[in-house]
Amino acid sequence: MGRRPGRCYRYLSKKAYPKSRFNRGVPDSKIQIFDLGRRKAGVLEFPLLVNCISNERENLSAEALEAARICANKYMVKHAGKDNFHLRIRVYPFHVLRINKMLSCAGADRLQTGMRGSFGKPYGRAARVVFNQPILSIRTKESFRDAAVEALRRAKNKFPGHQKIQVSSKFGFTNMFSDEFNKLNESGRIILRGGSFSVIREKGSIDKFKRDLEYAANN
C-alpha cells in the first residue's frame, strides 16, 4: 500500500495527538537532524538571519521537513561552503497522524466494518504550524545573503500552503535586534559564550558589575 497523499492531513482540524502511554506504536520521525552547517560558530561570526515563515495554519509532515532540510543544506553547501552558515529546523513533528485502512477488493464488506470503529492506527508524524511561525532559519555572513534566500525559497517548495522568506532584523539566532546588539557590543556590555551571549545589566552589586565589564573587555 502506497503512502497516503499529504493533502489528507494538511489542515489543523482537531487538537494535537502526541505520543503518550495512550498512543503507542508510533513510527519514528523521518527527520532526525535539526541543526546543520557550522553549529558551534560564535555569535559574531554569522550576523545575518533569514527565515522561512508560514502563512497558514497547517500540518507539515516529517517527510516534507526532511526534504526541505536536505534541499536547503545542499544549496548552501554548494554556494556558500559548509563552514559559512548554520541551518536550523524550528519546528518538531510531535503530532501523530492516524490511518483507518480500508480494503478495496471484492467482498470487502464481509471482511471489515467500514466506518464503525474508525479511529485509526498511528501512521506518521507531522509538525503543527500557525501564522507567522518560523519553519526554517539560516544564520550566515552578509556576503551570502542571496544564497540563503534562494536556499529557503527552494526548500519552501517542499511544503504545502504558502510561506514567505524574511530577512530578519535580529542578530543571528539571538533575540535582539541588530542595532541594539551592536550598540551593546561596542559599549562592552556583551559577554560572548561561544554560540550564546550574556548582557551585562545595571543591577546587582557594583563589584560584580565591574568584574563583568572587565571580563567582557578581556574576551
Swiss-Prot record:
GO MF terms, alphabetically ordered: structural constituent of ribosome
Gene3D superfamilies the record matches: Ribosomal protein L10e/L16
BP terms from Gene Ontology: translation
InterPro entries documented for this protein: Ribosomal_uL16, Ribosomal_uL16_CS_euk_arc, Ribosomal_uL16_dom, Ribosomal_uL16_euk_arch, Ribosomal_uL16_sf
Keyword tags: Ribonucleoprotein, Ribosomal protein
UniProt xrefs under Pfam families: Ribosomal_L16
Highest taxon listed in the record's lineage: Eukaryota
GO cellular component: ribonucleoprotein complex; ribosome
NCBIfam families recorded: PRK04199.1-4, uL16_euk_arch
Record note on quaternary structure: Component of the small ribosomal subunit. Mature ribosomes consist of a small (40S) and a large (60S) subunit. The 40S subunit contains about 33 different proteins and 1 molecule of RNA (18S). The 60S subunit contains about 49 different proteins and 3 molecules of RNA (25S, 5.8S and 5S).
Similarity field: Belongs to the universal ribosomal protein uL16 family.
The name this protein goes by in its record: Large ribosomal subunit protein uL16
